[in-house]
Amino acid sequence: MSEEVSRNRVERKFWSPSVTSQFCVCPIPFHFDTYRGCTYGCLFCFARDLTEFARRNKDENHKRQSYLEGNDPKGLLKWIEKTMASAYDYSKAEVVAFKERIPVKIGATADPFPIIEKWEHITYDCLKIFDKLDYPVQISTKNPEVFLSYAKDFVGSNIALNVSCSFCDDDIARQIECGAISPSRRFAAIKELSKLGFKITVRIQPFILPYSEKVADRFIKTLSECGAWDFETEGLKMRVTSSLKERLIYKKMSEALGYNVLAYFKKRGIIEGGDRVYSAEDKRSMLSTYTYLAKKYGLKFFNADNLIDSRYGCGCECCGTEFLRNHKIWGGSKRALAFKDSGAISSEEFGKCLVNFTRNTNKHNLTIAQVSRMYKVNRK
């Protein structure tokens, strides 16, 4: 029996692309996961609680984040065919987003390249479907080696590939990004992918102070040497009210980094909503450092932090999608408005969609454009 046949096959079911509630801030709030769940076990993962909460609510036997489910490429093809044949329906934001060619983000809440992708080829099959339409796609992963294994099939495709890597030290990463391949292996894969012509964005999300500041020069120099096109950053957040499980996670992170991460937040951070975040002063200092290093090493730099300021970063498309062919963004988002001269084309049709896809039912009869304007006024 072949190795492929002997392996257990992942459970498959179709879920369609969807618009996220981040449209007030993000110019590309459109995502599609090829898998659900993740085996990489990063201690700072924001998607873990979202996934496990959703599974508890659906009575799925409290399946943990590490339990993988696969999407159905055949279902995706049917959805696309139906969407392309339909008229604009502003009660279905995901349909309008697709028809307007807003880039679809693959890997927003689940890595599209788990080890099983080597034989399941779910992400591969989905990418082939998008590729036939030359549809703009942004991919986020911690395992570019899997994509590298079949990357030659996508040379010249309308793809922006993001590789997530918050650390440049293998020993530290091994303790915090527990199941992911080492940074050195990621850098090696980036080098090979860049040789094939892929423009690679490295996501330093999150940056963790003061560690990230100390290694910044060495880190960005390494990215330049391995052929990355750009990098993007966002500061770490911690919930103010944390469970015992979360406190143990912070303890593990502290042990790996050699200082008390939570104590640093309490001393130098601020509370924003329900999260502890770095102060504006510390963020600006870090963003200024990254801006300088990007120029020093010939890279583009994008700021993905909620501290949005046109002085930091090369534009509003912080996930490195600006070079994608024939795409639009949501120009009414805060980030897009901060970079009005970026040259990006805004989708006015997307702004007409009803916000009936969020848990806040008070806004279900309002449009994306209306809610975005309200957000802008309330944040002044």
PLM regions: where:
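Conserved radical SAM core fold
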Residues: P103-P114, P144-L148, L161-A180, F207-L209, ...
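Generic structural signal for well-ordered alpha-helices
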Residues: L77-M84, Y124-L127, A151, R186-K191, ...
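Hydrophobic faces of well-ordered beta-strands that scaffold small-molecule active sites
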Residues: V104-I106, V137-I139, L161-V163, I200-I204, ...
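Anion (oxyanion) recognition and catalysis
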Residues: D131, V155, S194-K195, S224, ...
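Auxiliary Fe-S-binding modules of radical SAM enzymes
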Residues: S2-V5, K214-K380
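Conserved strand-turn element in the central/C-terminal portion of the radical SAM core barrel
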Residues: G179, E192-E213, E272-A280
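Conserved Radical SAM active-site core
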Residues: E3-N162, D170-D171, K380
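Conserved non-cysteine loop/helix-boundary elements of the Radical SAM core domain that shape
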Residues: R64-L68, F113-H121, D171-K191, I208-R218
